[in-house]
Swiss-Prot record:
Protein name from the UniProt record: Brevinin-1Sa
Homology family: Belongs to the frog skin active peptide (FSAP) family. Brevinin subfamily.
Species this chain originates from: Lithobates sphenocephalus
GO cellular component: extracellular region
Organs and tissues of expression: Expressed by the skin glands.
InterPro entries from the UniProt entry: Antimicrobial_frog_1
Length: 24
């Protein structure tokens, strides 16, 4: 359960951070 959340966050969070910070 937890590894799945960590894996999804690992893929999703960088994209959000990239969009917010405009550093891609």
């Amino acid at each position: 359960f937890l590894p799945a959340i960590v894996g999804a966050a690992g893929q999703f969070l960088p994209k959000i951070f990239c969009a917010i910070s405009k550093k891609c």
